[in-house]
From Swiss-Prot:
Keyword Ribosomal protein: yes
Subunit structure: Part of the 30S ribosomal subunit. Contacts protein S5. The interaction surface between S4 and S5 is involved in control of translational fidelity.
GO cellular component terms listed in the entry, alphabetical order: small ribosomal subunit
Keywords in alphabetical order: Ribonucleoprotein, Ribosomal protein, RNA-binding, rRNA-binding
Gene that encodes it: rpsD
Protein name as annotated: Small ribosomal subunit protein uS4
Keyword Nuclease: no
Region annotation (Disordered) ranges: 28-48
Length: 208
């Protein structure tokens, strides 16, 4: 029951933001390609600049499943880092442990990836890490604990069951799926990160 409620809530959020946050939500949006609520089918009025920027920020937050405080901290770090703030922001978020667990194909959704980390199934360079926000460094190895490898969710993942979520592994990851291992070979580039976002709108939202 809880899973069904969560799935419906995610589907509703996906429709509101105009982006599928999970494979189930994508199927739901195919059946109902309009916003949620009784006025979902009605022609939408022109959004204000603020509303457009707010929605884009919410879209990015939702794709990484993070809280506003986490997003704000990441933005402040991105702003202080040399380069384009919007690109820096997405590159920093992509180096989160839960994001890389998802990209590697160990999980089907960001929520599942976060759960695997919190439940201490994931190691970084041989050390258990239970913080989804942990920043993985270049060259570090993300892998599943040996005692967890035989669990059904990981057996399913090792067989490639989640390849439809992300058919092509990003170039910044070296993944050995059968061994449930993934190495971050270098810092991600914004152009390679598989998230839908006009990051400049996010920058403008926080700079207001």
């Amino acid at each position: 029951m809880a899973n069904n409620t969560r799935a419906r809530r995610t589907a509703r959020l996906s429709r509101a933001l105009g982006i599928a946050l999970t494979p189930k939500a994508a199927k739901y949006m195919e059946r109902r390609p309009y916003g949620p609520g009784e006025h979902g089918r009605a022609r939408k009025k022109q959004d204000s600049d603020y509303a457009v920027r707010l929605r884009e920020k919410q879209r990015l937050r939702a794709q990484y499943g993070i809280r506003e405080a986490q997003m704000t901290r990441a933005f402040e770090e991105a702003r202080r880092t040399k380069g384009l703030t919007g690109e820096n922001l997405i590159e920093l978020l992509e180096m989160r442990l839960d994001a890389l667990v998802l990209r590697a194909g160990f999980a089907r959704t960001i929520a599942q990836a976060r759960q695997l980390v919190v439940h201490r199934h994931i190691l970084v360079d041989g050390i258990r890490v239970d913080r989804p926000s942990f920043r993985v460094g270049e060259g570090q190895l993300v892998h599943v604990h040996s005692r967890s490898e035989t669990m059904p969710p990981f057996q399913v993942a090792a067989a490639g069951a989640h390849r439809d979520v992300l058919p092509q592994v990003p170039a910044y990851l070296d993944v050995k799926l059968d061994a449930l291992q993934a190495r971050l070979v270098r810092r991600p580039k914004r152009s390679e990160v598989p998230v839908t976002c006009e990051e400049q709108l996010v920058v403008e939202f926080y700079a207001r």
